[in-house]
Amino acid sequence: MYQYINKIVTIIFVHNWIAILYFNFKKLPFKQAIKLPFDFYYKVRFKNLKGKIIIKNENIHRGMIKIGGRGSEMFPRNPVIIDISGTWIIKGITEVGIGSYIHVASSATLTTGNKVKLGALNKLYCEKSITLGDEIAFSWECQIFDTNFHYMKDLLSNKILEKDTLINIGSFNWIGNRCSIMKGTITPNNVIIASNSLCNKDYSLTPEFSVLAGSPAKVVKNIKRLFEGTDI
């Protein structure tokens, strides 16, 4: 009996039905929107919805993209902020944690693979291109920025440095809490990034099953994460 009551309470009070109906039918073709793939929890702020949302998945279903639920048992229920001027391509199941911020600039493209999880209080700021592969998990308070926000000049070479550089995170990456993934970061598949690390370069030649740690991050050991339900 308790389970049924709890389920009813969750449906009524936890799910943000105004946001669910508004966002799905505003941003998706009717045949997709009617399935309500976007599921919003608690508070959400739509700062800008001028961009495009493209779901590239044949199995679109109710609640496949969950926004604002992850981490709600641990952190204050601050609103998720959605700021989409550019294009967000979604290839599968996606979770965005409570209190997170998603920004995609007008000329930018954010691509997220299947089974991508952004933890609570994550900040993703896409000014050019951010690509996240399949089965990626970000812990809480991470930031993913493909921009420095300002131009800078190398005084030795007199060269103006690039402000924006793409980010590409490989599949089966696990990113610990409070990591900073900065512009130019590229990782191979099957990499762990230890908590409080800063990544800011191309790590594509790094062997799979490496652990990156530090600021800036470097390889410290080789280890494999076991995914519940897959490896255990």
Q: Residue locations for each model-derived region?
A:
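Domain-scale signature associated with acetyltransferase and cell-envelope carbohydrate enzymes
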Residues: M1-F145, L166-F172, C179-I181, N189, ...
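Short helix-loop boundary/capping segments
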Residues: H150-Y151
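Short acidic, glycine/proline-rich loop/turn micro-motifs
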Residues: D154-N158, K224
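A short acidic, glycine-rich active-site loop
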Residues: N158-I167
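Conserved beta-strand->loop/alpha-helix structural units within folded catalytic cores of enzymes
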Residues: G176-N177, S195
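Short beta-to-alpha loop/turn elements within the nucleotide-binding domains of ABC transporters
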Residues: T185
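Alpha/beta-hydrolase-fold catalytic nucleophile elbow
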Residues: A194, A213
